């Protein structure tokens, strides 16, 4: 029976382009996972959107002298194009500045307030006398009181992952003017997180399938003692509080952004013309929701969002899994947008194809510890693995069939033990590799699939059809038939990671249907419209296609084309110099 799988993906702040650190830790893993489940015929809903609110957007707007809406709409549009080019197949990628999201977020806030889970309290907050304003979270930087990191933000330390209150920073400084702000009293709303301690601990105990890094972080976070969390801010840009007399305050972005998973599911439902179908993913206890995030977002998704759901409506499904990734570094340093030490995805895709990037980032995915992107690693992976092990294998099989078997799948004779051994190994790989994809062990799935590609190379070298055909054409035909079935199967095993070239190989193997659908940019469902990204499924989806090849003899094959191109070694130094030049 098909499974119901929610793929809920972290919402990027719409204040700058996406860099490779973003896509390595969140978007490529989420898309790989979603594509696997679509190949299984499961019912998948993958949603996210641009985070349009919060101080990163207002800080960028003030720096440029434009409105926050100008900033978020600019980068929201760029996100849509980037995800489309990279093949990130969101069923819906929207943003948080929609009437639908306002409505859902305000309903949750109001309900929690009426139930007593949100209360008002006077708070000490940093105030800049020079700028004459309170300084919410990212308007302040300083030294982390826990790890000593000198550039911690007022809401979180990127070094140790702790959530912070700006008032706790050592030597705080205003990001607008650089001066030291002073503490002042202001009234704010707080979420009573301690009220959920027992329920959160019970929930955590059931999540034995979570990654160890996530389990340990959450357990330590709860055992350190939960504290009420502020849920309002003194800003003009954001979602107004739905409490009479407090409409001049807005919701704290960490509180309302996670609500986007629910509101985006509802928006997708509305766009589909089935206003209630979102409940299949949110109320059916058999449905499973997977949240793809970076490790810095663990507390918001593993503690705060579950608590919001518990307090708002206990019939809503809590996160089933949170496969949070560690961080990706770049050429020996952390990614830094302020220093421009980053590889921006639009820039990368202007020079290189998407599948080699997806392949390399999967091979170095920071699943359990930080990892590193290097240009040398990218070039070597492209040339020595993707091209040499997989691309060349496909090309030499297809060109041989085109040249010596009139471009048709050869008619095999009786298969011998070596033929059966290879096909049995690949058939067994569907269960083993499928289980790895399902457990979000994507590096291991890729490793196993590439190991099978090496087995096919060994098989060809042993059988040597280029020699067989001189003396026994039937034996060569059998070898090529087995090899074609092998690469047809491997095409599926690698398709979640390599959607573009797997689709290309699907056509080269004579198929007329498609593995995957289209990713389109179109108006959203609200009057007046806002642009969204939508995945339009292929006609072949909805059934389980995760099975070994049944490619039939006699099928005509189109002229072969190479799947990948070799990268020159000179690329390494050229790209390193480009990176150094832009970061100066």
UniProtKB/Swiss-Prot annotation:
Reactions that this protein is recorded to catalyse: tRNA(Met) + L-methionine + ATP = L-methionyl-tRNA(Met) + AMP + diphosphate
Entry EC number(s): 6.1.1.10
GO molecular function, one term: metal ion binding
Gene3D superfamilies per record: HUPs (3.40.50.620), Isoleucyl-tRNA Synthetase, Domain 1 (1.10.730.10), Methionyl-tRNA synthetase, Zn-domain (2.20.28.20)
Cellular compartments annotated: Cytoplasm
Entries under InterPro entries matching the protein: aa-tRNA-synth_I_CS, Anticodon_Met, Met-tRNA_ligase_1, Met-tRNA_synth, Methionyl/Leucyl_tRNA_Synth, MetRS_core, MetRS_Zn, Rossmann-like_a/b/a_fold
PROSITE patterns: AA_TRNA_LIGASE_I
Disulfide bonds: none
Oligomer status and interactors: Monomer.
Protein name: Methionine--tRNA ligase
